[in-house]
Amino acid sequence: MYQRMLRCGADLGSPGGGSGGGAGGRLALIWIVPLTLSGLLGVAWGASSLGAHHIHHFHGSSKHHSVPIAIYRSPASLRGGHAGTTYIFSKGGGQITYKWPPNDRPSTRADRLAIGFSTVQKEAVLVRVDSSSGLGDYLELHIHQGKIGVKFNVGTDDIAIEESNAIINDGKYHVVRFTRSGGNATLQVDSWPVIERYPAGNNDNERLAIARQRIPYRLGRVVDEWLLDKGRQLTIFNSQATIIIGGKEQGQPFQGQLSGLYYNGLKVLNMAAENDANIAIVGNVRLVGEVPSSMTTESTATAMQSEMSTSIMETTTTLATSTARRGKPPTKEPISQTTDDILVASAECPSDDEDIDPCEPSSGGLANPTRVGGREPYPGSAEVIRESSSTTGMVVGIVAAAALCILILLYAMYKYRNRDEGSYHVDESRNYISNSAQSNGAVVKEKQPSSAKSANKNKKNKDKEYYV
């Protein structure tokens, strides 16, 4: 249609259309091109609006106020059941170690960990994060008596959280998600309800953080020491130095498969597969580029569906405590109905003077679950709702482009019709003038030769008479 309109404009501007037609053609060309381009831009704008989704937050009753968190839906490439980068840890044990550069060690108030695994062990250490030497802060994901649990210490006491209902050493594929905010923690295995942990002395941390902003910097250390003496729970994981995967160094080597590890914005297994300079691999560790195999066909399907929740999109936001209470007991509905929306947020830069090194904000991630079977989400969680109105932009763009094309076509037809009528009248007038001119000229031309002949005849006759 665009080429047809250009040809119409060219016809309007041709010399056969006269001066009026040429001006109309030039005017048509001036308007056709920008209007058509604007229509195409309208279509593009409408199509681009499809990627936007409305974000809704559901806040339930919880102990702490939750800071709004931006959520983005995982792209299609991450929702196809792919388990991400997978490593097999064979008999004898192996280890993958990531070390932060000395000048880039983060101190965080909140941490996010997600990983998929399959094993038959009753005792093993999957992942451990340690602070710099001498500080003593750590976070450890482990298997104890066939149950998954996390233990961490951020400067006060060891805090432990465990899922005692789920059996995870059955050789099937499982996904575990852990979040920490200060001394609070949540843990979820597959589609089981979220477990919470609120240590003693941690009820007023948010108000304390606000009040500490008004305390002079030189007095911050004194206040922290006083609070520590009073049993106050500290909240900062200081100067994180290493991430150790496999547990060989802790004397409890892991045997099985680990997939899609994510910790505070770092996809460590992906980095290991890409030969990152900060990663070292030792022992019996082998890279596998496929979804983890399992003992049965049922567990294979479970692996592919469950891993849909382990791939993570990142965004930088501020995160406070966002926890959920225990829900109902798990149902027997398939895991394939779990959500594939993963929530990621950066850990807030601590205002706590507990930090030993200067704080640098670091990114973190939170796997945000919903209830199985399509029921309402857990309190305090957030859910992405894709509304049908997301196609409104595309519809508006297409309608606008179609309207512009129709107007341009009508305008071109109108100018083309006027050009035809004008050329007819002009040609008729020109023919009349030329015919009259030709008739007058013919009469004159006919008269002039006859007079010349008569003059010559008279002269000849006179000569003849003269000589005779």
UniProtKB/Swiss-Prot annotation:
Recorded superkingdom: Eukaryota
Post-translational modification: O-glycosylated; contains heparan sulfate. Heparan sulfate attachment is required for synapse development by mediating interactions with neuroligins.
InterPro entries according to UniProt: ConA-like_dom_sf (IPR013320), Laminin_G (IPR001791), Neurexin-like (IPR003585), Neurexin-related_CASP (IPR050372), Syndecan/Neurexin_dom (IPR027789)
Signal peptide region: 1-46
Region listing for Essential for interaction with CBLN1, in residue ranges: 201-230
Protein's membrane topology: Single-pass type I membrane protein
Transmembrane segments: 393-413
MF-aspect GO terms: acetylcholine receptor binding; calcium channel regulator activity; calcium-dependent protein binding; cell adhesion molecule binding; metal ion binding; neuroligin family protein binding; transmembrane signaling receptor activity
UniProt xrefs under Pfam families: Laminin_G_2, Syndecan
Residue numbers of Phosphoserine PTMs: S450, S451, S454
GO annotation terms (biological process): AMPA selective glutamate receptor signaling pathway; angiogenesis; calcium-dependent cell-cell adhesion via plasma membrane cell adhesion molecules; cell-cell adhesion involved in synapse maturation; cerebellar granule cell differentiation; chemical synaptic transmission; establishment of protein localization; filopodium assembly
Subunit (UniProt): The cytoplasmic C-terminal region binds to CASK. Binds NLGN1, NLGN2 and NLGN3, DAG1 (alpha-dystroglycan) and alpha-latrotoxin. Binding to neuroligins is calcium-dependent, and the binding preference ranks as follow: NLGN1 > NLGN4 >> NLGN3 > NLGN2. Interacts with CBLN2 and more weakly with CBLN4. Interacts with CBLN1; interaction is CBLN1 hexamer form-dependent; CBLN1-binding is calcium-independent; isoform 1b does not interact with CBLN1. Interacts with CLSTN3.
Family: Belongs to the neurexin family.
Function: Neuronal cell surface protein involved in cell recognition and cell adhesion by forming intracellular junctions through binding to neuroligins. Plays a role in formation of synaptic junctions. Functions as part of a trans-synaptic complex by binding to cerebellins and postsynaptic GRID1. This interaction helps regulate the activity of NMDA and AMPA receptors at hippocampal synapses without affecting synapse formation. NRXN1B-CBLN2-GRID1 complex transduce presynaptic signals into postsynaptic NMDAR response.
PANTHER family assigned: NEUREXIN-1 (PTHR15036:SF51), PIKACHURIN-LIKE PROTEIN (PTHR15036)
Protein name: Neurexin-1-beta
Annotated organism of origin: Mus musculus (Mouse)
